[in-house]
Amino acid sequence: MSLPEFSMRQLLEAGVHFGHQSHRWNPKMADYIFGVRNNIHIVDLTQTVPLLHRALQAISDTVAKGGRVLFVGTKRQAQDAVADAAKRSAQYFVNSRWLGGTLTNWKTISGSIRRLRHLEDVLSSADANAYTKKERLELQRERDKLNRSLGGIKDMGGLPDLIFVIDTNKEDIAIQEAQRLGIPVAAIVDTNCDPKGITYLVPGNDDAGRAIALYCDLVARAVIDGISRAQGDVGIDIGAAAQPLREDLPAAQATTFQGLPGPRGTPDDLKKLPGVSGAIEKKFNDLGIFHFWQLAELDQATAHQIGEELGLPSRADAWVAQAKSLTAEAE
């Protein structure tokens, strides 16, 4: 893997250079503005390109050192792109309303996450039958409300090491909390925003869907690059994991998974894997999966097959990558 490449042409085609109407500008962004066209400020992409590369490098370096990245984008245009990019790269996200204190009052947020996990476990188990229909409906509503706000960070396990933000005006509370805690901020900063306090500033359009999708894709790929570098540092052969199966191996054998009848000794805490709750861990166990090494040995097709069975196919690659890393650490 390597840091994702991009060109100025890609930025132009995505509309990254279009700022806001000139009368809505923030004078502190003057240094990053190329000019005005049809009363619209044009962002200087000759500055955006190196600054975006710098931000991607910082994100990759953070993950390579074992750090966590939190994607933040609660505006309508960013919600899906932020969630998809975070899931694809086994990271974390907030794409609904930012709860005040998400970072600065993590202890309280952790309590809400525990409540969310409890509700998920109760509603997915036979214990749910002990409640009346009305009580189950109330529990489901509470779970859904908590999941909207906390679902993207319930597996984070602690404060992030860097946050990536779309629209610094809308996410000003998140940025202030990160600054108070000394957490670096990489952010897309439009011509109507204040660049003060942004660690890795990237001047560009923060409203266009294509531009947001491009930013999120590049950041996700930078994270994956960092994960690959981290695995390389602990001696995992990334190239070997990507090699095709030997030709003399029957195709059916390549996708057939044989689980264990029970754990061999103490089972591993599978909740350490991204997106795995207590309920998902139980489903893993039902499939005969109790240890990280079992996942680390899976080929891509089998991993995706298991992901489909658990209802989380997009997490399969991240599970295998994390399992390999945890297995290497244990050795």
Swiss-Prot record:
Gene3D superfamilies in alphabetical order: Glucose-6-phosphate isomerase like protein, domain 1, Helix hairpin bin
InterPro entries: Ribosomal_uS2 (IPR001865), Ribosomal_uS2_bac/mit/plastid (IPR005706), Ribosomal_uS2_CS (IPR018130), Ribosomal_uS2_flav_dom_sf (IPR023591)
Any one GO cellular component localisation term in the record: cytosolic small ribosomal subunit
GO molecular function: structural constituent of ribosome
Taxonomy, superkingdom: Bacteria
Record keywords, A-Z: Ribonucleoprotein, Ribosomal protein
Protein's GO biological process: translation
Family to which this protein belongs: Belongs to the universal ribosomal protein uS2 family.
Identification of the protein by name: Small ribosomal subunit protein uS2
Origin species: Rhodopseudomonas palustris (strain ATCC BAA-98 / CGA009)
Higher taxonomy: Bacteria, Pseudomonadati, Pseudomonadota, Alphaproteobacteria, Hyphomicrobiales
Gene that this sequence comes from: rpsB
